[in-house]
Swiss-Prot record:
Entry EC number(s): 3.1.-.-
Lineage: Bacteria, Bacillati, Cyanobacteriota, Cyanophyceae, Synechococcales
The family this protein is said to belong to: Belongs to the endoribonuclease YbeY family.
Gene of this entry: ybeY
Name of protein: Endoribonuclease YbeY
Pfam families for the chain: YbeY
């Protein structure tokens, strides 16, 4: 792997989280409460951007590696809201765990100093269900879903089993790199 030293990265994160007080009995520990904090997610995404930018071997658009300023949106929403987005934009019925809407689409972004990556939407209700199903914490599930959405913002797709396996492995790699 070819690793390089990078200077400071700037991230503008727009974070929104609905009121999920109905789940407060399931979200008791301090670590879990971090998922509702903008500063937590800013640190997570900055860590992932730094990890990616330090290594040019990743399959990402080349112009990403020259940038130092990024922005993205993250919204933690309900099943009802994500089902509505899923129907409108993906033509699929029902809720899903995570949706991402990348803005990066062509090389014209190459000339910009600041890159708007796009938006990630995560259903807290689906994340809770999946954390029970997979027998890990809601914190872990939210990080997993955010990493999946983030990679989609960077142009990753999983149209076949091989691509999906590579993406899931890279998600795990990013998660293990969190400070």
């Amino acid at each position: 792997m070819k690793e390089k030293i990078i200077s400071e990265i700037n991230l503008d994160l727009v974070f929104q989280c609905n009121n999920f007080s109905q789940f407060s009995n399931k979200l008791k520990d301090t670590k879990t409460n971090l998922i509702f904090e903008s500063i937590f997610w800013e640190k997570v995404f900055l860590s992932w951007i730094n990890t990616i930018l330090k290594n040019e071997d990743y399959e990402l658009p080349n112009y990403i590696f020259d940038k130092k300023s990024f922005s993205l949106g993250l919204q933690i929403i309900s099943n009802q809201e994500i089902a509505s987005l899923n129907k409108k934009w993906m033509q699929k019925n029902g809720p899903t765990d995570v949706l991402s809407f990348p803005i990066i689409s062509d090389e014209s972004l190459n000339n910009l100093d600041h890159i708007e990556l796009g938006d990630i939407f995560i259903s807290l209700e689906m994340a809770l269900e999946q954390s029970y199903e997979y027998k890990h914490s809601i914190y872990r599930e939210m990080i997993w879903l955010a990493s999946h959405g983030f990679l989609h913002l960077l142009g990753w797709e999983h149209n076949n089993e091989h691509d999906l396996e590579n993406m899931l492995n890279f998600q795990e790699y990013l998660i293990t790199r969190l400070d």
